[in-house]
Amino acid sequence: LAPTDKSEEEILAWEMEGTRDEEIHRILTVIRPLLAETDSIPIIMGGDFNVHSHLDWTEATRNLYHHGGAVVNWPVSIAMEEAGFKDSFREMNSDPVASPGVTWLADADSLETECRMDRFDFIYYQGKTIQAIASECYDNSLGKTFTFKGEDFFYPSDHGFVLSKFELK
């Protein structure tokens, strides 16, 4: 979790102490040949990235969700964008204040803006033959029952999830 009492520079220095930036660059290097084919074969890449997004830590959210006044260009989401990927949730829900897309809560019983919460789970995509047409985030907590499409499930994660719908052209 970001030390939100710090400046953007201090937060980014803290982030770079970890391995996520190195990991995403390694992944992007490995899939580079596939990225060259996205004009005809789309790519969807999703999961628990366990990192914040620059699309959520904006001027509009700087004083919400314990961002501590910071606007941060998080390196992993920047790397994904620079590699040509689109964030399906943020593309369909462009306002991070109206649609924060919470998938992780420090206090799982609160959705208050004072609560430590963020979106760590993403579905990225790219390609000329694919377009996101809907995307939702579901927040939930480890061990709670979760109802999805009328069915009850034991929820095995401390993160919620993203559900995006795509149209193939």
Can you name each region flagged by the protein language model?
Residues L1-G18, A60-G68:
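A solvent-exposed, charged loop/short amphipathic helix patch at secondary-structure junctions
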Residues I11-D39:
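A long, amphipathic alpha-helix that forms part
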Residues P33-I44, N50-K169:
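Metal-dependent phosphoester-hydrolase catalytic domains
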